[in-house]
């Protein structure tokens, strides 16, 4: 994780990197998904774990989160996949279990579609679709989430949650039994988020935008998504039902003061997602 953490800081040109990396973090301040709690079974039935095979562990290991958006389709972050010509057989999906390694029946993937405009997370378009070889059997614990529609207006007043199995602080990973974590976060307006990131980078990027239109910010001090949660869902309650509003994309550290996490804004990609699903379902 330290490598990706360094890369994140380098890309943003942040000062005093060594201070951020070595700053002591009290485990009392950062628990769960960073300020979160264990998730009840079935509360977030669209949450999936994306796996790749590790020869070191001789097992399919968790690399990212994702969301079931149709019985046969998963939405995750493009940076979880990386290559546009990724081999679908290199991936597996676990659905329907809050325990990360509690289920031996993993789902196969037979198509991977990385957004054509994706270069890296900082430049946006950080979304990818995975088509499952067979549709997931829906149940109380496995259910697709509705996509945020273009007409939804998401504000800081909305009830929003982020979930995942990632690190619980900048310096520690989730301990066994690897139970799904949940945390309530607040959406931050893009203009406010932009200012916060410019302040964090000491205005080294004043000539360019950091938070693009296809991004969305959320978090609050001590509560945030962290490394292993990439690709996972940010959902908000819109007119009484949960909508997938964001895909965990990038950020500086974890749950730092006045620095929200950055998500791919699902609304921006709905036409593309629907087009791909129609084309390949």
Model-assigned labels for residue ranges:
Residues 55, 73-74, 80-81, 98-100, ...:
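Conserved beta-strand elements of beta-rich interaction domains across eukaryotes
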Residues 27, 50-53, 74-77, 82-120, ...:
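Conserved H-D interstitial segment of serine endopeptidase catalytic domains
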Residues 117-119, 135-186:
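Active-site substrate-binding loop(s) of clan PA
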Residues 74-78, 124-149, 281:
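Conserved active-site neighborhood of the chymotrypsin/trypsin-like protease fold
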Residues 46-51, 74-76, 128-131, 158-164, ...:
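A structural motif
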Residues 1-75, 92, 214:
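Protease-domain processing segments flanking chymotrypsin-fold serine proteases, especially trypsin-like
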Residues 47-59, 174-281:
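Extracellular trypsin-like serine protease catalytic domains
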Residues 35-42, 118-122, 206-208, 225:
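Conserved, non-catalytic sequence blocks in retroelement Pol enzymes and Pol-derived host proteins
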């Amino acid at each position: 994780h330290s490598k990706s953490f360094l890369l994140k800081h380098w890309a943003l040109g942040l000062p005093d990197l060594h201070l951020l990396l070595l700053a002591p973090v009290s485990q009392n301040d950062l628990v769960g998904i960073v300020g979160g709690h264990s998730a009840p079974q079935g509360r977030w039935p669209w949450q999936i774990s994306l796996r790749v095979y590790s020869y070191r562990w001789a097992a399919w290991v968790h690399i990212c989160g994702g969301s079931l958006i149709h019985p046969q389709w998963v939405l995750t972050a493009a940076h979880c996949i990386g290559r546009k010509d990724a081999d679908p057989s290199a991936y597996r999906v676990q659905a329907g279990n809050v325990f990360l390694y509690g289920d031996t029946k993993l789902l196969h993937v037979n198509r991977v579609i990385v957004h054509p405009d994706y270069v890296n997370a900082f430049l946006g378009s950080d979304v990818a679709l995975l088509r499952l070889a067979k549709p997931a059997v829906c149940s109380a614990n496995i259910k697709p989430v509705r996509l945020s529609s273009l007409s939804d207006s998401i504000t800081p007043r909305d009830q929003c949650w982020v979930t995942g199995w990632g690190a619980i602080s900048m310096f520690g990973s989730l301990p066994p039994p690897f139970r799904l974590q949940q945390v309530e976060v607040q959406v931050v307006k893009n203009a406010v988020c932009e200012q916060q990131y410019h302040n964090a980078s000491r205005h080294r990027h004043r000539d360019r935008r950091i938070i693009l239109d296809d991004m969305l910010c959320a978090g609050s001090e001590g509560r945030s998504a962290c490394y292993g949660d990439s690709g996972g869902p940010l959902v908000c309650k819109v007119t009484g039902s949960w909508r997938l509003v964001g895909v965990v994309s990038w950020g500086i550290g974890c749950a730092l003061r006045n620095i929200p996490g950055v998500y791919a804004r699902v609304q921006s990609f709905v036409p593309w997602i629907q087009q791909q699903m129609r084309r390949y379902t």
